[in-house]
Amino acid sequence: MNNLLTGNVPARHTRRRLPSRPFLKWAGGKRRSLATLLQRLPSPDEVECLVEPFVGGASVFLGTDYRQYLLADINADLIDVYLHVRDDPAGMIKRLERLFLQGNNETAYRENRDEFNRIQAGPEKSALFIYLNQHCFNGICRYNKQGIFNVPFGRRKAAYIPETEIMAFARKTERCHVSFFHAEFEDTLKMTTAGMFAGLSCAVYCDPPYLPVSQTAGFTAYSGDVFTVSDHERLAGQLAALHARKGMPVVISASDTLISHRIYGEAGFRLYGHDVVRSVSASAASRKTAGELTGVLMRGQGDKS
């Protein structure tokens, strides 16, 4: 595969504390890849703000110390959860205690899933989202084309209320300035040069839904819409244009596939390969090490392999 670099470089970030665990399970979450990403992301001394158009489980937010963050996702339910946890973490925990008390069985799960799909956005729906995340099969977040959450019950022996993680997330939002947006990636990238973010030095980190390594390896739909090869091409092109126009550092994560190499390599990304253990998969028995790419667009970056 062309344009692939390997090797480690010293981390650009000095951690004052161990990063908190995310309170949500998330397919492709970056907790296990954080050390690798910190080698590539600019440090908080180099940029003021980190922009994430695909915030997902928020592992990178929790594992870095920028002064400002623009965190966005196309999944409106996910963004609502983060807003409600930020604004009232204690109230969220109380709601979860009630849901979890008698909730670890398939009958209760189906009732709560139906309720989640029926009610409007609000604190109760966000609590149900966390409940479903902790009780569904492998923590998968999946919707059908009608926007209905349809993941089956996971049959776990015990479900865990992520109280410590929720409180840690809320405390992190108090230590920095965080803006949450429900937005597609195009609109999020436009925000980096407008309004309150226009005068800031920003870096962009993108963790889009991965292209599967095979036809049966997995899905790339977490909001009811599939993230296609064409979407990856548009993303790569827009990131390259933003970097060329504004000099903004850009880091992306992608699956280590031929098509990922083509898309991001042709857009000018320097590609670094590493292995990561997948913690969420369609089959619990098939969890294994997989190849992952980190792509970088950064001015003045030499070959650090």
Regions found by a protein language model. Give the residues of each.
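Short, surface-exposed loop/helix-turn segments at secondary-structure junctions
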Residues: 218-226
